[in-house]
Amino acid sequence: NDARRQRQMCIRDSSYAETGHLCLCTLHAGGTKQALERIQSFFPEEQVRRLWMDLSINLRAIVAQQLLPRRDGDGRTVVVELMLSTLLMQEHIRAGDVDKVTELIKRSSKYGMQTFDQALIAAFKQGLITPEQALRAAESENDVRLAIKLDSPLRGADGRSSLDVETPEGRFVDKWWLDR
């Protein structure tokens, strides 16, 4: 029922946008890539090429958000993925290259865009969330883990990260390897 309502809303908003109206639409999606895939799923295969063309012309932004518990236990903090419609983004959307969108967002921070992983790293560096929260919410756990480990305030004088644990043999390893 909810999916049908979202489909109807998406089709209606697409028609409104073609006439120059500002349309805001909410979707249950985990990020930009998933939102675009979900929008595509609302349309029959024979309309997908036109959909990508319409989106490349009319779509201005996709904002995705997650609420995570704050490190200090005082409520939640928001992390936001933001995709803006640049010429290159329009080209990728027009071509239906949804798989390239996240990488393009990642490389477009100078335009104000950011991925969830970039937002998680920023929230961690600001002390808003713990490393574990950042890793649990990450799209690419490895990328976020690396950014956390390279963050100098996390490293002690011995060079170890807060994510390192001592093994029974007396070695220090990343907790991630032990969890596998």
Predicted ranges, named:
Residues 17-18, 124:
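Conserved ATPase "switch" residues in P-loop NTPase domains
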Residues 19-24:
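Loop/turn-to-beta-strand initiation segments
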Residues 12-15, 35-39, 119:
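Alpha-helical scaffold elements adjacent to nucleotide-binding pockets in ATP/GTP-utilizing enzyme cores
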Residues 1-11:
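Single conserved hydrophobic/aromatic residue that forms the stacking wall/gate
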Residues 27-28:
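Short beta->alpha connector loops at strand-helix junctions that form conserved
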